[in-house]
Amino acid sequence: MHTLVEEQLFLSKTIFEEEVFSEGFSIIAGVDEVGRGPLAGPVVAGACILPRGKIFAGVNDSKKLSPKERGRMRDILVNDPDVYYGIGVVSVERIDEINILEATKEAMAVAIANLPVHPDFLLVDGLHLPHKIPCKKIIKGDSKVASIAAASIIAKEYRDDLMRELHQRYPDYGFDKHKGYGTAAHLAALKAFGPCDCHRKSFAPIRRR
């Protein structure tokens, strides 16, 4: 059971959705990405439609949750029959080809296309997304909007799982720990072993090698 405080906190994150509902839209998807900054691995986007009026206590920006909390919330969301979500993955090769910003937009478009239900409005974290569906950019939306926060949780957990799989193929780099971000340990591994196939060749630390 969730507490009254948790319920109120969640409801405070549905204000943007309620404003859009009041304008006559009925199916609202939150959209977010993870993995723009890492030196390795794909960029992943999530799109999520939450059922109106249902409380999901604990939904928050994925970066503000512990791994345990995030995993628990991911399981709650993806196993709820009233929650609809889609995931988009854009490869390292594609990132290097079109740049990370365009790759992020592409991942978002794929995530939206992969939703099992078609939304009629999009709330997008931080980016203006050219799309045939009406959309609104929300700065720091993953901490303000419930559906964007849910999308961020689903995308983050999905990408972390992919990076753990890459660790099995390339164990020298520690992808299971830093998930491709440019930590001191990752930079040291790059210096020792050079880049592997899943490193982003267009990113400065790898491009300079």
From Swiss-Prot:
Its main location: cytoplasm. It catalyses: Endonucleolytic cleavage to 5'-phosphomonoester. It comes from the Bacteria. Manganese or magnesium. Binds 1 divalent metal ion per monomer in the absence of substrate. May bind a second metal ion after substrate binding. It is an enzyme of class 3 (hydrolase). Gene3D superfamilies: Ribonuclease H-like superfamily/Ribonuclease H. Pfam families: RNase_HII. The keyword Membrane does not apply. One of its GO terms (molecular function) is manganese ion binding. Keywords: Cytoplasm, Endonuclease, Hydrolase, Manganese, Metal-binding, Nuclease. Belongs to the RNase HII family. Endonuclease that specifically degrades the RNA of RNA-DNA hybrids. HAMAP family: RNase_HII_B (MF_00052_B). This is Ribonuclease HII. It comes from Chlamydia felis (strain Fe/C-56). The gene is rnhB.
